[in-house]
């Protein structure tokens, strides 16, 4: 089992010392959140809070995903950084390919490209991208990012994007794992075609159903390649629970030590955060 340290919506000056501490403590990876901006007016709902409220995000600091990962990659040597998750279809896929390929090449293939479709029309409006057909759009984006990060010539002609034969360098020396986030069946189907699935949290029984579904979709598609399953689960906080998750096929447990979905700034001191992640490493990571 691998363990991924999660922190978000906190003082952005904490990220560098937290990444260093997570690497020293034995975590395999760290999640990197993504958000472009917060709208003044919105009636759309957040899918991972009970009431759909997302006002807690107002004013929360989000360093741009690629910028933050580059900074953290420069001060670590082993820790992988998993985007959790990048709102891919609101961005130009060729630019994402250049950013992801450059980043992975620069920090030694330590990038997991977690992607998803933003559920909020405001993100699409801000970036000048139609909200309609976002599922088909992300499918094309994934194919383009894959193709343009190989270091070979690649072309693509689809409904939304037309890429002439093009080569991007530098390219990473290993393929960038593409991990798809989301609980909808369309997201699970997309994940089954990719390199992994990222769980957004929720009911334990629902997690079992989602894991079984994505496994079944991979079997139906004849997929036998290595596949990552990243989950948020209370079972991830005990040795016995981790073993149960392993038995279900989970490869990566995402662990955080506070609930970020709260109003106002995060007031937890840096040293408390570091001690929390160290205690978990001592009590769980070191024993599995």
Swiss-Prot record:
It comes from the Bacteria. It comes from Mycobacterium tuberculosis (strain ATCC 25618 / H37Rv). InterPro entries: Diverse_substr_monoxygenases, Lucif-like_OxRdtase_Rv2161c, Luciferase-like_dom, Luciferase-like_sf. GO terms for molecular function: oxidoreductase activity, acting on paired donors, with incorporation or reduction of molecular oxygen. Pfam families: Bac_luciferase. Coiled coil: none annotated. GO terms for cellular component: plasma membrane. This is Uncharacterized protein Rv0940c. Transmembrane segments: none annotated.
